[in-house]
Amino acid sequence: MGEFVRVEIDQAIATIRLERPPMNALNAQVQSEIAAAAAAVSDDQQVRGVVIYGGEKVFAAGADIKEMADASYATMAQDSRRLQDSFTAVARIGKPVVAAITGYALGGGLELALCADFRVAGEGARVGQPEILLGLIPGAGGTQRLPRLIGPARAKDIVFTGRFVGAAEALAIGLVDKVVPDGEVYQAARDLVGRFANGPAVALRAAKQAIDEGLDADLDTGLEIERLQFAGLFATEDARTGMRSFVENGPGKASFAGR
């Protein structure tokens, strides 16, 4: 798809593959290509799940510091908007998304992984938000998505110290969902997202939107979001198929068309 970001589709699973060696630094071009890849997999009706992968050695080691070093306030005010928008495009993919984390996921790399629904890490993976060591703070969602995932105190520890978090600790605090041997990360991520590939695509999208949008709202608003999504699914073929199959054959045996 792009020079540094490829989209590969196999058996209804799309892989957004970062390829900017040696560390997949997230420069402006990579950011734009990530946004384009997110749009492509969102629009492709044949895609039922997405894996974000940086290769066997590294997920992404953050922003390109050389590119940022001489930036002015005015320049960064504009550039940071592009960065946030590119990651938000990933967070808004209306399908299950799994980040397959090998090696380092630091700074913008971790912030990209936070945009996924689930994170699978290799045993040797290390994640963190080291921007404070540069006299900065996270600028692509780290101060917002991280505390929503692991709580404010743990997020402040990671952001304030800039320390690297190993895979075992990341699993213990809920920062990643599964840890596997380093050589098995990509397949484990595919296996995880593959659980949803034959599911009711419209209902999965509705569930994701209801949860994600509800987290940014008060309870009453969240319940209203849920109610509208729930009611809307009664207009889908999948809901009719699922309920009919339940009555006739019992739970878990429906074959969904994604409509």
Residue ranges and their predicted role:
Residues M1-G55, T88:
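Conserved CoA-thioester-binding segment of acyl-CoA-metabolizing enzymes
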Residues M1-I13, D43, G162-A168, Q187, ...:
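C-terminal alpha-helix plus adjacent terminal tail
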Residues I13-R17, V51-Y53, S72, V98-A100, ...:
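Structural motif
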Residues I16, E33-I34, I52, D64, ...:
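Terminal peptide-recognition signature
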Residues Q29-E33, R82, A89, A188, ...:
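Charged catalytic carboxylate motif
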Residues S32, Q46, G54-A89, A105, ...:
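Glycine- (often His-adjacent) and acidic-residue-rich active-site loop
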Residues A91-L204, T236, T241-R244:
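Crotonase-fold acyl-CoA enzyme core
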